[in-house]
Amino acid sequence: MILMKNLILILIFAAVGFNTMASNPVHVIITAGQSNTDGRTPNEDLPAYIKALATDTLTYAEGAYRYCQIAQNDGKGEFIPFWPRAKRSGKNNMWAFDAVTYYWLEQLLQEKFYVVKWAVGGTSIAPDYNASKGRFWSAAPEWLAQAKPTSDGGNSLLLSFIQEIDMCIDKTLSRLKA
């Protein structure tokens, strides 16, 4: 009988929790990848409709989207207004395809949305188990069991990405108000 009461209470709390979450949904996009996701094209080549959002009209290095908030590769779970600004090989202000995607999502949604992104160029999908260096996107359980996140000095991009998602949920997404 006590077990049944506890089970009913758990189900009630779960239903109330899910109802609260469902009544206040937010849009969250999760993006991960390698060089093509991390930015390889100079901001000078942005489409004109995105350049129009720039506050720096010489190199298009600064600006902000109205609704898109992003947490990218920082391991802190903190969102900032999105602007294409990847840095590669001494070149600043590079962009990837997602800059266009987020722009059109803004036009469609017309409300704040969040992006959790972990994208690193020069990485590999399949780990070389004998490599002492490198950063890898792998979900192989035997490899993950011995790997550490790149954000902690290891070589697993997936574990870093998972940490970033957790931090974003804990610091921001779970605390949003309607």
Residue positions per predicted region:
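N-terminal secretory signal peptides that target proteins for export/translocation
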Residues: 1-4
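Sec-dependent N-terminal signal peptides
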Residues: 6-16
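Sec/Tat signal peptide C-region and signal peptidase I cleavage site
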Residues: 18-22
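Cell-envelope and extracellular/periplasmic
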Residues: 23-178
